[in-house]
């Protein structure tokens, strides 16, 4: 038994540590080196796991006294070791674990203990002493020069580091040089670790050079020389490794050979399976030829070469693409209607158009025709509508996100000769679908962009055009693929961003934002049920009142869809579950007060109409990405020289509208009872509140005109009126967009009467009936009509 390094002369030890231990068979590792070692014993594997889980990947490596002892006693372990960091860990098929160890510190072990089938070392790490005096440095330099001159040992690298005065690096370099030397005995390595000065290590290096290849150095009478090298093994290994190194080398070699053989056997077996499938299944002849050609190349190539991997991946892809597999469609319009109604509230026109499309498809048995494209803001149900259509038709559903795609190869794939090449997104999605007739959702098709790597929109044209997609060409598979049985549906947020060539082949279905009433129905009939089901709650445990839904919709969300609404409902459900599990409550009825308690203070405040009718203040109607809102416009006059000031972060279009409105009022001042001289004696200030929010658009013309007339004639405008429409210099009122959203916001804000362009009368049918019931909508074609209603009829 060797209890080595109980005392080391002149060494100051650092703090005591406790770390798990792995035991090697006759292999002793030097500091500042790294090695990959394989461990198979249970205690060592347990120690590796403990190191990774509890000790920040630190572990102590020690050697056992006898390499032949399978389970050495703690007394048969050396009391000197190294502390290592685990960096790579791999588990082999036979259960052994291969790890890469980086050795950085030496440790004197005071005691070994065994806990939970893991060996732990309790000891103190210690460091080497670096030279401080000139005399010490001179001796080191002399030793290096002696190695060079007398013993023909190349010390140029050591001298270079010495001249840099980097003694830490010099110390590490000596360890690394000795570690790479063949047949360094275990005893020598132990003595090297015991040594704490660079000069002592250089003396050991000199002994190794002088006595190679038989070098063994005795360890201060404290260490037995048990690292005898078997002569027969020395002969076989040509004096390059000792017994323990040979055993490790052979084990590692056997494992690698076994892995290679297993890989080759599995490849051969897989290729045989592919050949059998080609014989039994109806692959197209041209596809069979390509696959068989690649299989033959694999069989003639050197195993493990890069070309084999390229061909193997190609064969795997070609065999996994659905060349003939199809799902059976459901042709039942009533069932389709039931599915759409089940998953979506409202959207009457959208559902009608979808049913019409499916009816034509069922009648003609063809998918030719425009590609359905859902256009609308985020969260209004574009993707879920596509899923519902897939369910109604019994089709597999696959989705490809095109947002941010700039490279044509994303669509058509890379040629297989490139490193890491693979098919494009279309073929990849078909592989996931496992049938050649899925419903294919092209999400955010308006977000594609072109650059110097090609134009993905042009590639998408080949995908979507029925005249071209019968022979879609993917660069990787190098075989035409028939996409004519695929049903494509696209989604977009903005029509204007869709490439023109694609837009020409699309049937646009607009999904506008939901009204507050629709959101409440969706929350009650869909979202709440979904959340209760996901959280395994019952309606008896958690119930929302209509007032609670209204509170969340108005003051905690500002969106066109219902995603944020769903998140807030889920937040309340989670907070309730916490209280439920803590035993604080057993059920909860969510009211306005509970919403504020669970979600905190209001996030949004909707703009309300003015409390009083005022001079120079008129309510306009705006359309935003979140739906509609009202837009108060203020005009004030004061003594000046006829200047016009615009504030409120207005866009260029809105600034032009203000200029046109002022010009129109000046040109028709007599009709409005305004003195011509007044314009020269005053300055006019137009302001749109919430100055930090950008505002633009062409629909504020009649609102600006009315506010100017009110301010100049000192006539108030009723607080119950709202209006929208652009104006020309001749006083014509031009049509606007977003009438549905604007009408909803007007009713929500408490307005009773709105004026709209007469050319928008056709859009009134899109306004929800519940809004029409509380809001009077009057069309106007010229500004005289507006003036008549606002200033004449209203003041009588």
From Swiss-Prot:
GO cellular component: cytoplasm
Record has Repressor as a keyword: no
Active-site residues, as the UniProt record annotates them: 699, 742
GO function terms (MF aspect): ATP binding; ATP hydrolysis activity; ATP-dependent peptidase activity; sequence-specific DNA binding; serine-type endopeptidase activity
Reactions this protein catalyses: Hydrolysis of proteins in presence of ATP
Record: residues binding ATP: 376-383
Transmembrane intervals: none
Family affiliation: Belongs to the peptidase S16 family.
Protein's name according to its UniProt entry: Lon protease
Organism of provenance: Mycoplasma mycoides subsp. mycoides SC (strain CCUG 32753 / NCTC 10114 / PG1)
Organism ancestry: Bacteria, Bacillati, Mycoplasmatota, Mollicutes, Mycoplasmataceae
Gene behind this protein: lon
